Amino acid sequence: SSDLSPAVEQRLWDERDIPALQLMTQSVHEHGALAAIELVHNGHHSSNLYSRTPALAPSSRSLDIIYPKQARAMDKADIREFRRWHKAAAIRAKQAGFDIVYVYAGHEMSLPHHFLLPEYNQRIDEYGGSLENRLRLTKELLQDTQEAIGDSCAVAFRFAVDQMLGRNGMQAHEEGRAVVEMLADIPDLWDVNVSGWGNDSATSRFQPDSGYQTEYTKFVKQVTNKPVVGVGRLTSPDMMVSLIKQGVLDFIGAARPSIADPFLPNKIQQQRIEEIRECIGCNVCVSCDNLGVPIRCTQNPTMGEEWRRGWHPEKIVAAKTPQPVLVVGAGPAGLECALQLANRGYEVILSEASKQLGGRVISESNLKGLAIWRRVSDYRIYQLQQMDNVNIYLDSALDVQQVLELGIEHVFVATGALWRKDGIGRSSRTPILGLDQVAIYTPDDIMSGVSLGPGPIVIYDDEQGYLGSVVADHLSDLGHGVSFVTSASIVSPFTELTLEQKQVQQGLVAQGVGIYTNKTIASLSQKSGHVGVELKCHYGGEDQWLACASLVLVTERESASLLYEQLQQLQEDNGASSPMPIPMSVTLIGDALAPGLIADAVFSGHQGAQEFEADPERVQQGLFKREMPSLNA
């Protein structure tokens, strides 16, 4: 009665699920660590699209997903049955080799949490009403689990002490504290955070400070004698140590930071602080969970590729024959490619056309809310600067002739991409008419600090990613009057995957930005001597005209791949048109290959370095290596 399909989650429904989980616990134990499992029934947060079983909830209500179905209210028999299920699952967890078993009441995603919160629980029996009644099921689950496996397993309780809704939800200093006081020393471990998931895994755009949850969770150690673990995108080792020394936490929880750098604890212990790849809080990892695809990370391109491609975050295959390699362009792809080629032992020449390393990472980090993203370039630049086999040249744009003069046989081209100025994007493959009537800008202009003139600014977001709303917020914060036009039905729909969309749109509304959804810009025209944009409704609604002095187009990017194309052409004609030897290999990477997220660019750069001079058969196998269903079951 709890299935999140199509999301890919582990299951412990019956004994058949134990062997796969045992493989994990055995590996964890081989490294001297404890294995923990979080048992969860998702209540009305379940989709049950796979099982087709009606979802369960404290009170009847609509499902959390966009599907016209409701969860049914649990009766007393359902509650007894649920307790039995949970207890049996705890026993299976013990059999699978887990050392710590969780009862889960967080993120507004579990039945215990739903029972605990009045907005979900309108019962009038002993499981509803007062806090003591609403907490009853959670207390019973903790006691049931202790009884079943407490002789050999620790029982942990994950609890969101604050919903960050003020008086409209649970608050840490009121019912949140009361829950901890009422359960106090029943769990063996308190794992505390805030809810919902968008608050617990907040992006750096909206929660830039490391340890932002501490103000909500710091009371817990004062109330219980049991150890406490907490989270909050804790990336600073100094802060981690401080929280321990101050008695705020006993253990540091580092989920996203450990995705960015799985060797985070080792590097702290060994005082290798400069080698830590710090999480940037972009939530690309979260987006993959929401999409039901293998996890990935902007900072750590090996994440999710350990088995499929055999990549390791700290190790890489040494070069067969160390030789010079040229990387043209020092954005995220070029930096990562250069770093990994150097780690392999090649002599790397890194050429950057501008006076600063980092490319789009530096540009985007200049915008409001994205400063922490600069860590992507900071980490790689520092590592490259420590290496004797790397030579970096700034203010060094290279054309074909100059590349040939260098005489380097292997070239990687990471020359990025530029935003279009003609309006071509998702909704239209033809340019917007009349663009010559106003000043036209793109995110490239805004990120470089170009000053916009007076008068109303219209931002046209036909990309539907994150950047359009960032630019709108940035310009509004500078005091400009901004209107936001998008072909989507909401602002920046991609940010739903990163748990930010509501905050994004709320922020623009609070800034006074006019929002026009389901609209495309067909053309520019004049009315009463003023220039404006003609807005067309996707669904045939009434056309609108909007005054516009400056138009910022966030529609699509064009790869800056001319250098690659010219070098490739020389290879095509076997150098017949060149008086000098041509490179043996030319590889296009990053946005120059295919514009995407910064995470995509970093991955592309890493892939280029990994697969350089690799066995083609191994590369091909890595691309298609996948899990296959067994026909013997």
Task: Please report, for each region that a protein language model flagged, where it lies by residue.
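Hydrophobic, well-ordered secondary-structure elements that form the walls
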Residues: 190, 220, 243, 255, ...
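A conserved short coil-to-beta-strand element within the FAD-binding core of flavoproteins
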Residues: 393-406, 517-531
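Redox-cofactor binding/interface segments in oxidoreductases and associated redox assembly factors
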Residues: 103, 192, 254, 411-414, ...
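N-terminal glycine-rich dinucleotide-binding loop that anchors FAD/FMN and/or NAD(P) in oxidoreductases
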Residues: 276-280, 363-392, 425-438, 496-523
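Flavin-dependent oxidoreductase catalytic cores
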Residues: 2-328, 332, 337-343, 347-348, ...
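Terminal amphipathic helices with adjacent charged low-complexity linkers/tails
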Residues: 131, 358, 363, 414-417
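Short beta-alpha connecting loops at secondary-structure transitions
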Residues: 200-206, 227, 250-251, 361-369, ...
